[in-house]
Amino acid sequence: MSLRIQCVCIDCADPAVLARWWADVLGWRVTADEGDEAVIEPPAGSREDGVVPDVVFLRVPEPKTVKNRLHLDLRPVDQQAELARVEALGAKRVDIGQGDDKTWVVYADPEGNEFCVLRALTPEEVAEDG
């Protein structure tokens, strides 16, 4: 394949704050904070295959006003523990019309960007992830 995703960019009002928040949520590290742009990367050694992109937070002047057209889906080992953890970090549950019968929960980060915490990994999936 000749292309790969280098990074995922998220528009925001305060790149430094949102990068730190997402780094805490994902267990990643902030590797750049240059005022209008901040970058988080996964821990060293977690992307030897080059598949995991950086996340870049870019300052924009306009506030978020509608539902995201792109969002992150996070797959935990223990969904209930992660729901409690992201809420303790400041994530807010949001209703985007998903209903109560879903295996995922929709949240918003401190600037209102939606993301989902999916069902927990099965033991087989955990073993595959090593």
In which residue ranges do the predicted regions lie?
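Short acidic, gly/pro-rich beta-turn/loop elements at beta-sheet edges
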Residues: 18-20, 50, 65-67, 82-84, ...
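Acidic pyrophosphate-coordinating catalytic loop
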Residues: 43-49, 62-65, 112
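A structural detector for beta-sheet-dominated domains
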Residues: 41-43, 58, 75
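Core segments of cupin and vicinal oxygen chelate
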Residues: 2, 9-53, 82, 88, ...
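Vicinal oxygen chelate
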Residues: 3, 5-12, 32, 39-41, 53, 60-81, 85, ...
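Short loop segments at secondary-structure junctions
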Residues: 13-14, 43-45, 77, 110, ...
